[in-house]
Amino acid sequence: SWWYHKKPYICRVFLYISFPKSQNLTYYIDQFYFKKNKLWMFKLMGAYTFNKSLINDSGLKFIKLFGTGSRDGFSLIPDFSSYVIITSWKNDHFRKKFINKNSIINEIINRSSSRVEIKIDPYGITGSWNGINPFKNASSYNGGKILVITRARVKFNKLINFLFNTSLAARSIKSHNGAEFYKGIGELPIIEQATISIWKSEQSMRDFAYSDTNHLKIINKARKDKWYSEELFVRSNILSLKQYN
Protein backbone atom coordinates (compact mmCIF):
# COMPACT_ATOMS: atom_id res chain seq x y z
CA SER A 1 0.00 0.00 0.00
CA TRP A 2 1.55 3.31 -1.08
CA TRP A 3 0.25 5.07 2.02
CA TYR A 4 2.76 3.16 4.06
CA HIS A 5 5.78 4.05 1.96
CA LYS A 6 7.99 6.98 2.89
CA LYS A 7 8.49 8.03 -0.74
CA PRO A 8 5.22 9.64 -1.89
CA TYR A 9 6.30 9.80 -5.53
CA ILE A 10 5.61 6.06 -5.79
CA CYS A 11 1.93 6.84 -6.01
CA ARG A 12 0.94 10.47 -6.07
CA VAL A 13 -2.75 10.91 -5.90
CA PHE A 14 -5.75 13.16 -5.71
CA LEU A 15 -6.92 13.47 -2.11
CA TYR A 16 -10.47 13.94 -1.12
CA ILE A 17 -11.01 14.70 2.56
CA SER A 18 -14.33 15.06 4.30
CA PHE A 19 -14.93 16.39 7.75
CA PRO A 20 -18.02 17.69 9.51
CA LYS A 21 -19.33 20.74 11.19
CA SER A 22 -20.84 18.80 14.08
CA GLN A 23 -19.97 15.71 16.07
CA ASN A 24 -22.47 13.51 14.18
CA LEU A 25 -20.85 13.80 10.76
CA THR A 26 -18.33 11.54 9.06
CA TYR A 27 -14.83 12.31 7.79
CA TYR A 28 -13.10 10.86 4.73
CA ILE A 29 -9.96 11.18 2.66
CA ASP A 30 -9.93 9.90 -0.92
CA GLN A 31 -6.77 10.05 -2.96
CA PHE A 32 -6.82 9.77 -6.76
CA TYR A 33 -3.77 9.05 -8.89
CA PHE A 34 -3.57 10.32 -12.48
CA LYS A 35 -1.25 8.67 -15.01
CA LYS A 36 -3.19 10.33 -17.80
CA ASN A 37 -5.66 13.23 -17.92
CA LYS A 38 -3.31 15.45 -15.90
CA LEU A 39 -4.07 18.49 -18.04
CA TRP A 40 -7.81 17.92 -17.61
CA MET A 41 -7.45 17.83 -13.82
CA PHE A 42 -5.21 20.90 -13.85
CA LYS A 43 -7.86 22.80 -15.81
CA LEU A 44 -10.52 21.68 -13.32
CA MET A 45 -8.34 23.00 -10.51
CA GLY A 46 -8.09 26.34 -12.29
CA ALA A 47 -11.82 26.50 -12.97
CA TYR A 48 -12.57 25.77 -9.33
CA THR A 49 -10.21 28.54 -8.17
CA PHE A 50 -12.46 31.10 -9.87
CA ASN A 51 -15.78 29.34 -9.28
CA LYS A 52 -16.08 27.75 -5.85
CA SER A 53 -19.62 26.52 -6.62
CA LEU A 54 -18.29 24.29 -9.40
CA ILE A 55 -18.21 21.27 -7.08
CA ASN A 56 -21.36 21.21 -4.99
CA ASP A 57 -23.90 18.73 -3.69
CA SER A 58 -26.65 18.37 -1.10
CA GLY A 59 -25.17 17.39 2.24
CA LEU A 60 -21.84 19.01 1.39
CA LYS A 61 -20.94 21.45 4.17
CA PHE A 62 -17.34 22.46 3.43
CA ILE A 63 -15.00 22.12 0.45
CA LYS A 64 -11.42 23.02 -0.50
CA LEU A 65 -9.41 22.00 -3.57
CA PHE A 66 -5.59 21.80 -3.55
CA GLY A 67 -2.60 21.16 -5.74
CA THR A 68 0.35 19.21 -4.33
CA GLY A 69 4.13 19.36 -4.27
CA SER A 70 6.34 16.96 -6.23
CA ARG A 71 9.38 14.90 -5.18
CA ASP A 72 9.37 14.57 -1.38
CA GLY A 73 6.03 16.32 -1.19
CA PHE A 74 7.25 19.73 -0.05
CA SER A 75 8.66 20.94 -3.36
CA LEU A 76 7.56 24.22 -4.94
CA ILE A 77 7.38 22.30 -8.22
CA PRO A 78 3.78 21.06 -8.62
CA ASP A 79 2.88 17.40 -8.83
CA PHE A 80 0.47 17.45 -11.76
CA SER A 81 -0.69 13.90 -11.01
CA SER A 82 -2.00 14.82 -7.56
CA TYR A 83 -4.74 17.12 -6.25
CA VAL A 84 -6.63 17.40 -2.99
CA ILE A 85 -10.27 18.11 -2.19
CA ILE A 86 -11.32 18.65 1.42
CA THR A 87 -15.02 18.48 2.25
CA SER A 88 -17.43 17.93 5.10
CA TRP A 89 -20.74 16.02 4.95
CA LYS A 90 -23.92 15.69 6.97
CA ASN A 91 -23.43 11.92 7.06
CA ASP A 92 -22.26 8.89 5.07
CA HIS A 93 -25.47 8.76 3.07
CA PHE A 94 -24.77 12.11 1.42
CA ARG A 95 -21.15 11.21 0.78
CA LYS A 96 -22.08 7.90 -0.90
CA LYS A 97 -24.70 9.66 -2.99
CA PHE A 98 -22.09 12.22 -4.06
CA ILE A 99 -19.56 9.53 -5.01
CA ASN A 100 -22.17 7.59 -6.98
CA LYS A 101 -24.11 10.36 -8.71
CA ASN A 102 -22.18 13.65 -8.82
CA SER A 103 -21.05 14.17 -12.42
CA ILE A 104 -17.76 15.91 -11.62
CA ILE A 105 -16.55 13.47 -8.98
CA ASN A 106 -17.58 10.59 -11.26
CA GLU A 107 -15.50 12.01 -14.07
CA ILE A 108 -12.56 12.41 -11.69
CA ILE A 109 -12.92 8.77 -10.63
CA ASN A 110 -13.23 7.55 -14.23
CA ARG A 111 -10.23 9.55 -15.44
CA SER A 112 -8.00 8.60 -12.51
CA SER A 113 -5.78 5.51 -12.37
CA SER A 114 -6.40 4.63 -8.73
CA ARG A 115 -8.07 5.87 -5.59
CA VAL A 116 -7.44 5.43 -1.88
CA GLU A 117 -10.28 6.00 0.57
CA ILE A 118 -9.54 6.74 4.22
CA LYS A 119 -12.17 7.25 6.88
CA ILE A 120 -10.82 9.41 9.70
CA ASP A 121 -11.99 10.48 13.13
CA PRO A 122 -10.46 13.82 14.22
CA TYR A 123 -9.77 14.06 17.94
CA GLY A 124 -7.18 16.79 18.49
CA ILE A 125 -7.87 20.15 16.84
CA THR A 126 -6.27 23.56 17.39
CA GLY A 127 -6.56 26.72 15.31
CA SER A 128 -8.94 27.72 12.52
CA TRP A 129 -9.47 27.62 8.75
CA ASN A 130 -10.83 30.82 7.20
CA GLY A 131 -12.07 31.77 10.64
CA ILE A 132 -13.89 28.50 11.39
CA ASN A 133 -13.09 25.04 12.74
CA PRO A 134 -14.45 22.40 10.33
CA PHE A 135 -13.10 19.53 12.46
CA LYS A 136 -15.27 19.78 15.56
CA ASN A 137 -15.30 16.43 17.33
CA ALA A 138 -15.26 14.97 20.84
CA SER A 139 -13.25 11.82 20.11
CA SER A 140 -9.97 10.66 21.66
CA TYR A 141 -6.95 8.71 20.43
CA ASN A 142 -7.82 5.04 19.85
CA GLY A 143 -4.27 3.66 20.01
CA GLY A 144 -3.59 3.06 16.30
CA LYS A 145 -2.02 4.92 13.41
CA ILE A 146 -2.93 8.57 13.10
CA LEU A 147 -3.35 11.02 10.24
CA VAL A 148 -2.26 14.61 10.82
CA ILE A 149 -3.35 17.66 8.84
CA THR A 150 -1.55 20.98 9.25
CA ARG A 151 -2.60 24.14 7.48
CA ALA A 152 -1.29 27.73 7.47
CA ARG A 153 -1.78 30.99 5.62
CA VAL A 154 1.69 32.46 5.06
CA LYS A 155 2.07 36.22 5.38
CA PHE A 156 3.29 37.78 2.14
CA ASN A 157 6.23 39.51 3.81
CA LYS A 158 7.33 36.19 5.38
CA LEU A 159 7.38 34.14 2.17
CA ILE A 160 11.16 34.13 1.76
CA ASN A 161 11.72 32.83 5.29
CA PHE A 162 9.02 30.21 4.80
CA LEU A 163 10.37 29.00 1.46
CA PHE A 164 13.95 28.88 2.73
CA ASN A 165 12.92 26.39 5.42
CA THR A 166 10.69 24.18 3.25
CA SER A 167 13.47 21.80 2.21
CA LEU A 168 14.65 21.53 5.82
CA ALA A 169 11.17 20.42 6.85
CA ALA A 170 11.11 17.78 4.10
CA ARG A 171 14.49 16.35 5.10
CA SER A 172 13.48 16.36 8.74
CA ILE A 173 10.27 14.34 8.36
CA LYS A 174 11.83 12.04 5.74
CA SER A 175 14.50 10.95 8.21
CA HIS A 176 12.00 10.10 10.97
CA ASN A 177 11.00 6.43 11.02
CA GLY A 178 7.65 7.17 12.66
CA ALA A 179 6.31 8.89 9.52
CA GLU A 180 4.78 6.47 7.01
CA PHE A 181 3.48 9.05 4.53
CA TYR A 182 3.72 12.80 4.05
CA LYS A 183 2.61 15.22 1.34
CA GLY A 184 2.60 18.98 0.97
CA ILE A 185 -0.55 20.50 -0.51
CA GLY A 186 -1.56 24.06 -1.42
CA GLU A 187 -4.82 25.91 -1.90
CA LEU A 188 -3.00 28.88 -3.44
CA PRO A 189 0.64 28.72 -4.59
CA ILE A 190 2.93 29.31 -1.59
CA ILE A 191 0.41 31.47 0.35
CA GLU A 192 -2.14 28.83 1.43
CA GLN A 193 -0.16 25.76 2.48
CA ALA A 194 -1.00 22.48 4.22
CA THR A 195 0.45 19.03 4.86
CA ILE A 196 -0.99 15.56 5.32
CA SER A 197 1.01 12.87 7.10
CA ILE A 198 0.43 9.38 8.52
CA TRP A 199 2.24 8.22 11.65
CA LYS A 200 2.72 4.82 13.27
CA SER A 201 1.25 6.17 16.50
CA GLU A 202 0.53 9.40 18.32
CA GLN A 203 3.74 8.91 20.29
CA SER A 204 5.82 8.69 17.11
CA MET A 205 4.27 11.95 15.92
CA ARG A 206 4.99 13.57 19.29
CA ASP A 207 8.59 12.32 19.22
CA PHE A 208 9.05 14.11 15.91
CA ALA A 209 7.13 17.26 16.83
CA TYR A 210 8.82 17.85 20.18
CA SER A 211 12.21 16.15 19.82
CA ASP A 212 13.40 16.58 16.23
CA THR A 213 15.97 19.40 16.25
CA ASN A 214 15.28 20.70 12.73
CA HIS A 215 11.53 20.63 13.21
CA LEU A 216 11.79 22.53 16.49
CA LYS A 217 13.99 25.16 14.82
CA ILE A 218 11.35 25.73 12.14
CA ILE A 219 8.51 25.91 14.68
CA ASN A 220 10.42 28.39 16.84
CA LYS A 221 11.28 30.55 13.82
CA ALA A 222 7.67 30.56 12.65
CA ARG A 223 6.42 31.66 16.06
CA LYS A 224 9.15 34.21 16.71
CA ASP A 225 8.90 35.84 13.28
CA LYS A 226 5.11 35.37 12.99
CA TRP A 227 5.10 33.70 9.58
CA TYR A 228 1.41 32.84 9.58
CA SER A 229 -1.78 34.86 9.77
CA GLU A 230 -3.80 31.69 10.49
CA GLU A 231 -2.95 28.10 11.48
CA LEU A 232 -4.72 24.78 11.99
CA PHE A 233 -3.46 21.46 13.38
CA VAL A 234 -5.59 18.30 13.36
CA ARG A 235 -4.88 14.79 14.67
CA SER A 236 -7.18 11.98 13.49
CA ASN A 237 -7.69 8.30 14.14
CA ILE A 238 -7.66 6.23 10.95
CA LEU A 239 -10.86 4.18 10.99
CA SER A 240 -10.43 2.47 7.63
CA LEU A 241 -8.24 2.56 4.53
CA LYS A 242 -9.24 1.09 1.15
CA GLN A 243 -7.50 1.19 -2.20
CA TYR A 244 -9.29 1.05 -5.57
CA ASN A 245 -7.46 0.45 -8.86
Positions of PLM-derived features:
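Alpha-helix boundary/capping residues
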Residues: 101-103, 212, 222
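Tryptophan (W) side chains
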Residues: 2-3
